[in-house]
Amino acid sequence: VAGLRLGPLLRYADPSSATVWVEASRPCTAEVRCADGAGGTARTFQVAGHHYALVPVSGLTPGTTTAYEVLLDGRSVWPPPGSRFPPSVVRTPAEDGGDAVKVAFGSCRWAAPPADTEDTVGPDALDSLAARLAADPGAERPDALVLLGDQVYADEVSDAVEQRIRARRGLADAPGAEVADFEEYTWLYYESWLDPEVRWLLSTVPSCMIFDDHDVIDDWNTSAAWLADMRATPWWRERLLSGLMSYWVHQHLGNLSPAELAADPLYAAVRATPDATDVLRAFACRADADPASVRWSYRRDFGRVRLLMVDTRAARVLDEGRRAMLDPGEAAWLREQALQDRGSYDHLLIGTSLPWLLPHLVHDVEAWNAALCRGERGARWARFGERLRRAADLEHWAAFPASFAALTELIAEAGSGADAPATVLVLSGDVHHAYVAEPRWPGGSGSGSDGGPDARVLQLTCSPVHNSIPLSIRVGFRFGWSAVARALGRRFAGHGGCARPPVTWRRTGGPWFGNQLMTLALHGRSARLKLEQARGKGTLAVVEESDLTSR
């Protein structure tokens, strides 16, 4: 008899359709059956001995909320008997796209420990959100949960996962107490997504995901020298291929709409073979050999809100002479999606796990380091720069100066002119604190008050959902925004011969430290921001609330 091993995850919802992801214990037919008669079925596909399905749900009524159940080979497996949570539901937007849209986002989540053990990093923001929604099912809830990277930590496993690794293969050989292959990756997803609160939350709130480094390894693709060192190890290839395969199965597949899934040749090939392990492994090999041949970035439209989720890890160009955050094809895709039919959206959200605008000292140090690494101060400084880059995680947009300038230019273009949206908002995580920063253009197109774009442009950074915030991070990032730090940063930039960035910016909110989520409420051309921190089981405290469209 087929059982439900993981899920369900409600991944996509539009006015008339949805997708629901599950893992079953054996091959079977998965069915989603809605209370209003809508539904769908899908046969499981197999990867490395595991059985998955992404069920397309059709026939939904726009602007409604309907409960659903999951059946495997005709037997109901969700909701579980005696569940303490309300029924899982699919909530569809109205056909005209005129509804208010709420988008919650954050990044960096260690799996919460079992309920009977102490949580050393404090309450989990997703657990707290789930508890609040479960306590009042009629309360306002996000229309989408945007998870901006580090959904799992392949290089920082829990004690429980480490014990399983020790029992399976020992810890003597590299990568030791880190994930080695696809099977061990599945343990991370079980640990994270079987958390009862998170499991229910992901079953009833649609989610969008993108990887960051820890989904594979810390500093993933930080430089060409780093990659060469990793490829020289005996364990890296299996780790990377397994990371990409498990990401495709658990996260990427659900990012796609039913129409995109129907046109996806890899998805068709995976479903057409009794065991898709080799098919998916060949895909991961191609992604490793030629990253430009694969696109992990994607677009989601929520009525008149456009979300572009950008891959800032696998799409990099690492050659020091032409270093870029995005390869040419990826950059062209981002530009096309941002500028296409601009009059059809009121808000443009750019999801990039790595922040565009950083504290000024951090930005200048990253630009200086990039100059050293490309040899601007000679070979000795280049070697020092590479060591520093890895030790200090100097790999955000500022560490790719040409890409920083190109993104800045694209944001200005997308936000200017008669068809400009009300806002262009860059959503990021990674840095284990939250802040709001606003750029200021020295001139250029648009009729904005500062000579920049007509749209309100902001960097919104929110991290972590559930992770540690060492004192050094708190002190360092507070200092990084100060006038003294800005002056110090200019000294570094001068030493590297760095050009001034094309915009200046100032911090307008934060820094805030804690396990937290930001939520955008977007309606017509108005936008409001709320930052909430987890303060206890089921408690999210509002620490900031502001109107983003009034200047």
List PLM regions with ranges:
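Metal-dependent phosphoester/phosphodiester hydrolase catalytic core
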Residues: 1-551
